[in-house]
A protein has these predicted regions:
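Alpha-helical segment of the N-proximal tetratricopeptide repeat
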Residues: 4-54
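Register position in tetratricopeptide repeats
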Residues: 20-21, 54, 88, 122, ...
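Boundary/linker segments of alpha-helical solenoid repeat arrays
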Residues: 42-43, 76-77, 110-113, 138-150
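Terminal, low-structured helical/coil segments at or just beyond the last alpha-helical repeat
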Residues: 1, 140-167
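TPR/TPR-like (Sel1-like) alpha-helical repeat modules
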Residues: 121-144
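"A position-specific structural signal for the A-helix of alpha-solenoid helical repeats
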Residues: 9, 13, 47, 81, ...
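Alpha-helical adaptor scaffolds
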Residues: 43-111
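Structural marker of alpha-solenoid helical repeat scaffolds
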Residues: 3, 37, 71, 104-106, ...
């Protein structure tokens, strides 16, 4: 993939900055100024996905992530983002099916087994979820513990673990 032209890169960085500041309207305005033929660039798709996620436009998130997977399958973000958006759309089985095959390709990414654990928990597959969470903990225990503390997707798994401890 060719690098972005300086003007497009400027708008992309500005959009990213506006997103970090919580100003989605300005971020959208910057993205709108990027050349039309560069909207499928992986870096643009990543920032577009972030904007759509802030807006909770999960259908647009799925589309952006699918394009990202097509344009840059070597990047874990597209795979992770697509499944996250599918899960937000209550298409959790599909989220799991799409993310599970790349877990070995991106074995250094704790968020993949973590998200798989969330999806499996929501699907009622608690034992498999526990294995995935254990895998995530081996990769980055601090990040996983921070993410898991208040994650409602893992509540059924936590209850199961508590029951095992007490009983």
């Amino acid at each position: 993939m060719n690098p972005l032209r300086p003007a497009d890169l400027h708008h992309l960085r500005a959009a990213e900055g506006w997103l970090e500041l919580g100003n989605e309207a300005e971020a959208r305005g910057e993205l709108d100024q990027i050349s039309t033929n560069r909207l499928d660039h992986p870096d643009v798709l990543e920032i577009s996905w972030m904007l759509f996620a802030k807006e909770q436009n999960w259908n647009a998130c799925v589309k952006a992530a699918e394009l990202l997977v097509q344009q840059a399958p070597e990047r874990p973000g597209g795979w992770i983002h697509r499944s996250f958006a599918l899960h937000e759309l209550k298409r959790t089985e599909e989220a799991f099916i799409n993310l599970n095959p790349v877990r070995r390709i991106f074995s250094d990414q704790w968020v993949i087994p973590y998200n798989l654990a969330c999806y499996l928990t929501q699907l009622g597959r608690i034992k498999e979820a526990a294995r995935e969470l254990h895998t995530a903990l081996k990769i980055d225990p601090r990040a996983v513990k921070r993410a898991a503390v208040n994650d409602p997707d893992l509540e059924p798994l936590c209850k199961h673990i508590d029951e095992l401890r007490s009983g």
